[in-house]
Amino acid sequence: MSMRIWSRSSSAYSAIARSSSWFNNSLFSSCLLRFYSNPPKKTKKNTLISLRKSAETANEKFIEKINKEHQLFKPGQIVVDLGCAPGIWSTIAARHVGLFGRVIACDIIPCRLPENSSMIQGNILSMEIQLEIAKAAIRSRNSFFRNQQDHNSASIPYLQSVFEEERDTKEKAKIEDLSADVIMSDLGPPFPMVQGFEFWISKLPYLAMQTNEHLAVKDELDSLYLAQAALLFAIKALKPDGIFLCKVLESSHLRSFAEDLSMCFKCVKKIQFKTKIKDELYAVYFCSGKQLSCHSKLLNI
């Protein structure tokens, strides 16, 4: 009985090799096709990123709409943003006030802002932080007036006047000296954060805002309390023709707050805003024409 020995030169081996190569190539092609035709699975991180992005876009469109309808921001203004993180409202305000204006932002969580802005990290409920906001506004105003005058910035009289202004600012500054054109208040729960540079530079204050019972905004009453604190600050720090924009969680407790706003401002408009994060409904009050006779002791606070 004869036995046939298969070799590489045989036609049968070549046929098997060709069929095997075709099989491997088709398997590889089908794997590629399956990989690229099916979208990747959504992870928790990707979902959080898309949620935050949609929330930022909604906030940006909202404040731009208010600015377009009511001319909220103008060049050269001093704007105060309470609860500024992640800096959406402050960035838009800085874009409109220009280089001769100033945005002074305050929050427990730090954030990056444009060059014509000042970031003060702290709790707005602290009187020291409120004074720091006033000092930042005074410094900005003094700097603007100095730039309008033709002085040699390296001369001794000029430097001496700068030092004297800074000393007077530290010693005599009051909240009433702020004279802000616009005060915005968005004191609420922090935006969701994902792992990255932003999270690691603000990890501790972010966790404090989430867990500390004195800092966390848990319900409508906490949101109302912070809005009332912002109103008391605005009564002292706002210009007579200034604008107060306040965002507060919608609830049945807002009637007394609306009465307080009507006592302090001639014109009060209520705008509703729905967030993308927790699907919560907020009331945004646009207030103008500060009443000079308004006193904090007459309010329902």
Curated annotation (Swiss-Prot):
The keyword Transferase applies. It is an enzyme of class 2 (transferase). One of its GO terms (molecular function) is rRNA (uridine-2'-O-)-methyltransferase activity. Its EC number is 2.1.1.-. Keywords: Methyltransferase, rRNA processing, S-adenosyl-L-methionine, Transferase. GO terms for cellular component: mitochondrion. It catalyses: a uridine in rRNA + S-adenosyl-L-methionine = a 2'-O-methyluridine in rRNA + S-adenosyl-L-homocysteine + H(+). S-adenosyl-L-methionine binds at residues 87, 89, 107, 186. GO terms for biological process: mitochondrial RNA metabolic process; RNA methylation. CDD domains: AdoMet_MTases (cd02440). Pfam families: FtsJ. Gene3D superfamilies: Vaccinia Virus protein VP39. It comes from the Eukaryota. InterPro entries: RNA_methyltr_RlmE, RNA_MeTrfase_FtsJ_dom, SAM-dependent_MTases_sf. The active site is at residue 247. Belongs to the class I-like SAM-binding methyltransferase superfamily. RNA methyltransferase RlmE family. This is Putative ribosomal RNA methyltransferase PB17E12.10c. It comes from Schizosaccharomyces pombe (strain 972 / ATCC 24843).
